[in-house]
Amino acid sequence: GVIPCGESCVFIPCISSVIGCSCKNKVCYRN
């Protein structure tokens, strides 16, 4: 949860979750 994936998750889930990103504070992060 430290590397921003350049995607927000305010209205929809992280599409980048397929590469390991998850929602945190309305922004998608990985690791």
From Swiss-Prot:
<dbReference type="InterPro" id="IPR036146">
    <property type="entry name" value="Cyclotide_sf"/>
</dbReference>
<keyword id="KW-1015">Disulfide bond</keyword>
<feature type="disulfide bond">
    <location>
        <begin position="9"/>
        <end position="23"/>
    </location>
</feature>
<dbReference type="InterPro" id="IPR005535">
    <property type="entry name" value="Cyclotide"/>
</dbReference>
<keyword id="KW-0960">Knottin</keyword>
<keyword id="KW-0611">Plant defense</keyword>
<comment type="similarity">
    <text>Belongs to the cyclotide family. Bracelet subfamily.</text>
</comment>
<dbReference type="InterPro" id="IPR012323">
    <property type="entry name" value="Cyclotide_bracelet_CS"/>
</dbReference>
<feature type="disulfide bond">
    <location>
        <begin position="5"/>
        <end position="21"/>
    </location>
</feature>
<dbReference type="GO" id="GO:0006952">
    <property type="term" value="P:defense response"/>
</dbReference>
<dbReference type="Pfam" id="PF03784">
    <property type="entry name" value="Cyclotide"/>
</dbReference>
<protein>
    <recommendedName>
        <fullName>Chassatide C6</fullName>
    </recommendedName>
</protein>
<feature type="disulfide bond">
    <location>
        <begin position="14"/>
        <end position="28"/>
    </location>
</feature>
<comment type="function">
    <text>Probably participates in a plant defense mechanism.</text>
</comment>
<feature type="cross-link" description="Cyclopeptide (Gly-Asn)">
    <location>
        <begin position="1"/>
        <end position="31"/>
    </location>
</feature>
